[in-house]
From Swiss-Prot:
The lineage of its organism: Bacteria, Pseudomonadati, Acidobacteriota, Terriglobia, Terriglobales. This is Type III pantothenate kinase. Homodimer. The gene is coaX. GO terms for cellular component: cytoplasm. Its cofactor is NH4(+); K(+). A monovalent cation. Ammonium or potassium. Substrate binds at residues 113-116, 190. It holds the Pfam family Pan_kinase. Pathway: Cofactor biosynthesis; coenzyme A biosynthesis; CoA from (R)-pantothenate: step 1/5. It comes from Acidobacterium capsulatum (strain ATCC 51196 / DSM 11244 / BCRC 80197 / JCM 7670 / NBRC 15755 / NCIMB 13165 / 161).
């Protein structure tokens, strides 16, 4: 089996795929979303992942390879230790210097996060291009992949939860509120007012950026949502036509397949 970890600032998404002898992957066996904690130890990760696998009737010993995309550098060493201690292989970290097969046509390609690279690879494989991926996470990322399958840039905005926490932290009389679609547009109490402003304000931000990106691209564009808040927000967008919650994971799986094929071609096959 192939274990995939997408480590973000707020949540970590974990997935397990079937892995065949030739290095190909297909069936997504299970996914889990856990909180990201920088103080977590390698053994805590090991105990947690072992328990998650057991809940699906799976065991750590069946995991042949691990691929990781992390935007939390302080956790990288811990994750490496966790993988080497609980599995039989060193993890593959997707980051600068790792060939992904995705041309990155930006001013500073090494600055592009692994999750954004994976989003574009997954999107182009599934939908072709041009495609815009809106990733509703800690930040709301807009990742643009061209008709030729190139990452040509995008945008980064504060995520909805960050905006809500900023209001709570900086305005003494404003409470922390649940993120959900408001029942009406004119609020009659503070909680309603906050939910209306946060929810519809973020939808307005997303659609405003998408409208201008689509205009700049100049042709038909597919807009896809992923990330922890995609199911909450995407349905209200005028431009997002699909939610794909496993898009980043699928992109990481495809990078793994390309990496394994490259190693085998160059004589660096690690074996099963």
């Amino acid at each position: 089996m192939l274990l995939v970890l997408n480590v973000n600032n707020t949540n970590t998404l974990i997935a397990i795929y079937s892995l065949h002898a030739d290095g190909s992957t297909d069936e997504l066996r299970a996914t889990w979303r856990i909180s990201t904690r920088q103080g977590q130890t390698a053994d805590e990760y090991g105990i947690l992942v072992r328990s998650l696998l057991a809940s699906e009737g799976l065991v750590c010993e069946a995991v042949r390879d691990v691929v990781i995309a992390s935007v939390v550098p302080p956790l990288d060493w811990t994750l490496r230790q966790f993988c080497e201690r609980y599995f039989t292989s060193k993890p593959i970290f997707i980051g600068p210097g790792v060939k992904t097969g995705l041309p990155i046509l930006t001013d500073h390609p090494t600055e592009v996060g692994a999750d954004r690279v994976a989003n574009c690879i997954g999107a182009f494989h599934r939908y072709g291009g041009p495609t815009i991926v809106v990733d509703f996470g800690t930040a709301t990322n807009f990742d643009v992949v061209s008709r030729k399958g190139e990452f040509i840039g995008g945008a980064i905005a504060p995520g909805l939860n960050i905006s809500a926490e900023a209001l709570f932290a900086r305005a003494a009389r404003l409470p922390r509120v649940e993120i959900r679609k408001p029942a009406k547009m004119i609020g009659t109490n503070t909680v309603d007012n906050l939910q209306i402003g946060l929810f519809w304000g973020h939808i307005g931000l997303v659609d405003s950026i998408l409208e201008r990106m689509i205009s700049e691209l100049g042709h038909d564009v597919k807009c896809v949502a992923t990330g922890g808040l995609a199911q909450v927000l995407a349905g209200e967008s005028k431009y997002i036509t699909e939610v794909n919650e496993t898009l980043t994971l699928d992109g990481l799986r495809l990078v793994y397949e390309a990496q394994r094929a490259s190693r085998e071609k160059s004589g660096g096959n690690r074996g099963a």
